[in-house]
Amino acid sequence: MLAKRIIPCLDVRDGRVVKGINFEGLRDAGSILEQARFYNNELADELVFLDISASLESRKTTLEEVLKVSGEVFIPLTVGGGINSVERAKEVFLHGADKVSVNTAAVNNPELISRIAEKYGSQAVVVAVDIKKIGDRYIVHTHSGKQPTEYEALEWALKVQELGAGEILLTSMDRDGTKEGYDNESLALISTSVHIPVIASGGAGSLEHLYDGFTKGRADAALAASIFHFRQHSIREAKQYLHDRGITVRL
């Protein structure tokens, strides 16, 4: 059985790690490099670096920051934010990223997924899917959650899989930063409908929430920020907790 992964996420804005609630109310969560070093030493399985204002403000991810982080960590690094072309993806890879995450640009131009996958392999393409429950439907949003799209979550997940995505990073906007647990209903819906890995995101506030994301949500990996950034729990502690409850993790 493949080991479940624990992935801390660095949401970066103006050169600092930040964390908000429901994609709003950002507060400072420390230095990018200090957090990256910490997670590298904490046995994180991977690290995600998201420039959360890049697409919204039509800025490009700061390559210098990516280069610094990639020089500090020896675990797979996924970089997202403002990646809207194969050429931009190439620059990010050349600065040390192992994977790129696309979101807004993929919705605007779905063929971008295929083009990056054809050049670098599906394993290097993560499609970030931000969803919000409207009525009884999970609607995909773009531009840092500001703009609803025509896509429902499952429809878009199946489409990105067909286009060559290697993973889906599924974030519940309703749960983001709330520490109320992942939206395991939407997680299970997507995880059981696609054959590529699904990363749970949005809402982790306890070690039990990580466990639930794997068991109830059927996720392949759990992404978290608040509980790790502010040292509520360590990744080592989280992995031991999961291991003790029968979840296969890398210790």
From Swiss-Prot:
NCBIfam families: hisF. It catalyses: 5-[(5-phospho-1-deoxy-D-ribulos-1-ylimino)methylamino]-1-(5-phospho-beta-D-ribosyl)imidazole-4-carboxamide + L-glutamine = D-erythro-1-(imidazol-4-yl)glycerol 3-phosphate + 5-amino-1-(5-phospho-beta-D-ribosyl)imidazole-4-carboxamide + L-glutamate + H(+). Keywords: Amino-acid biosynthesis, Cytoplasm, Histidine biosynthesis, Lyase. It is found in: Cytoplasm. It holds the Pfam family His_biosynth. Its EC number is 4.3.2.10. Heterodimer of HisH and HisF. It comes from the Bacteria. One of its GO terms (cellular component) is cytoplasm. GO terms for biological process: L-histidine biosynthetic process. It comes from Chlorobium phaeovibrioides (strain DSM 265 / 1930) (Prosthecochloris vibrioformis (strain DSM 265)). GO terms for molecular function: imidazoleglycerol-phosphate synthase activity; lyase activity. It is an enzyme of class 4 (lyase). This is Imidazole glycerol phosphate synthase subunit HisF. SUPFAM superfamilies: Ribulose-phoshate binding barrel (SSF51366). IGPS catalyzes the conversion of PRFAR and glutamine to IGP, AICAR and glutamate. The HisF subunit catalyzes the cyclization activity that produces IGP and AICAR from PRFAR using the ammonia provided by the HisH subunit. The active site is at D11, D130. Pathway: Amino-acid biosynthesis; L-histidine biosynthesis; L-histidine from 5-phospho-alpha-D-ribose 1-diphosphate: step 5/9. Belongs to the HisA/HisF family.
